């Protein structure tokens, strides 16, 4: 009796061990692209944006105290925004990440280097992009693409302000289909 109980216990443990943790968490593709909305970008011959990190915030669940922003490195790290105006966009991040619901996004910019066309001088550009409240899901074996529409605005007629980079809007695609757009249109 003891021997059959030991064999049964061993087999039960092997079955439980084999079924647990073999497959990792499901993943989906998350891609971030940037483009410039035509405002004061025409003043520049080049505007190099260096991205530090792409950061997303999971929606808080039952363990809300364990929820923290997830950081990802951008690749390529530097993009010349003058080359991505209108419908053209630059891919700055693409990776498989764990599925889930998210409610925030932040594009952390390390530096901005602008060179003016007419004056042939470097021009400082202030980054005003901060965290954005944005609900989206990463589905298993699906693709979520976020296209950020940035804009450079000329405030030089309001000294001491100069050029500023801000977020004009975004487009959110799920499996190639547009699901959200701000501003609408």
PLM region spans:
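Positively charged n-region of N-terminal signal peptides that target proteins for export
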Residues: 1-5
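Generic hydrophobic-segment detector
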Residues: 8-9, 131
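Bacterial N-terminal signal peptides
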Residues: 9-16
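A short, compositionally biased domain-edge/stem linker segment
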Residues: 16-22
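A short, solvent-exposed, low-complexity linear motif enriched for acidic/polar residues
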Residues: 22-185
């Amino acid at each position: 009796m003891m021997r059959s109980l030991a064999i049964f216990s061993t087999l039960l443990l092997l079955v439980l061990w084999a079924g647990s943790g073999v497959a990792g968490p499901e993943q989906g593709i998350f891609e971030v692209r940037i483009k410039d909305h035509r405002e004061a970008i025409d003043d520049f011959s080049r505007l190099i944006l260096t991205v530090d990190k792409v950061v997303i915030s999971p929606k808080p669940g039952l363990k809300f105290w364990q929820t923290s922003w997830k950081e990802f490195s951008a690749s390529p790290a530097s993009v010349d925004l003058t080359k991505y105006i209108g419908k053209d966009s630059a891919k700055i991040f693409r990776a498989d990440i764990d599925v889930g619901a998210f409610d925030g996004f932040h594009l952390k910019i390390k530096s901005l280097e602008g060179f003016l066309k007419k004056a042939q001088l470097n021009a400082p550009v202030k980054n005003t992009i901060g965290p954005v409240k944005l609900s989206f899901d990463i589905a298993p074996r699906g693709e979520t693409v976020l296209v950020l529409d940035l804009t450079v605005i000329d405030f030089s007629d309001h000294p001491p302000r100069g050029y500023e980079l801000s977020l004009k809007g975004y487009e959110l695609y799920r499996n190639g289909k547009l699901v959200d757009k701000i501003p609408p249109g």
